[in-house]
Regions:
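Metal-dependent phosphoesterase signature
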Residues: 63-86
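Short acidic, Gly/Ser-rich segments with clustered Asp/Glu that frequently serve as metal-coordination loops
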Residues: 7-15
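Metal-dependent phosphoesterase core characteristic of DEDDh/y 3'-5' exonuclease domains
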Residues: 2, 15, 26-68, 88-170
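Short consensus segments that form the blades of beta-propeller domains
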Residues: 20-26
């Protein structure tokens, strides 16, 4: 089983190498969406949650990226502990965790599990990073040291389907 997920956050960490236990370093989770697929690609489960902010606000610069304001999150959001328990349940069914720049999303969720003092196996799961796996496939010049650059999710989609997509639609 493959657990494919993405997060939206309050921003970026100060230090991408910091441990998830460094709570002040890692931004807060605003939204998480995931799909669980069988080994044959069958869609098994779909979840999408906006998190109700407790003890933080969503900066305007982050809102401009994902479209979720503090007001909206307070009105539509659910408790973080519920989200973490649901996500843990899906993790327990999976063999691989998949995402685009997955190390960022794993650290975001790891920090939230740490803050909530909820145990998880997320940090120990096998991962597939579509950003890294698709770099040679997309073959976009401009990477470091003469290598190809990492493709954005939009660039990967364009290469796979020969058409772009509107990222703003996924944050509704």
């Amino acid at each position: 089983m493959y657990l494919i997920y993405d997060t939206e956050t309050t921003g970026l960490p100060k230090n991408f190498s910091a441990p998830v236990s460094d709570s002040d370093n890692w931004p807060r989770l605003v939204q998480i969406a995931w799909q669980l697929h069988s080994d044959m690609g069958e869609l098994i489960e779909v979840k999408n949650f906006i998190v109700r902010p407790e003890g933080f606000t969503i900066p305007y610069n982050a809102e401009k990226i994902h479209g979720i304001s503090t007001k909206r999150a307070l009105e539509k959001g659910v408790d973080l502990s519920f989200v973490l328990k649901e996500f843990n349940n899906s993790i327990s069914k999976s063999n691989f965790i998949v995402g685009h720049n997955i190390s960022f999303d794993i650290n975001i969720m790891g920090a939230e599990f740490f803050r909530a003092q909820i145990e998880t196996t997320l940090m120990d799961e096998k991962t597939i990073d579509t950003k890294e796996e698709a770099t040679d496939f997309c073959a976009i010049p401009g990477g470091r040291g003469g290598k190809f650059k990492w493709p954005t999710l939009t660039e990967l989609h364009s290469k796979l389907f020969n058409q772009g997509f509107n990222l703003s639609l996924i944050h509704i």
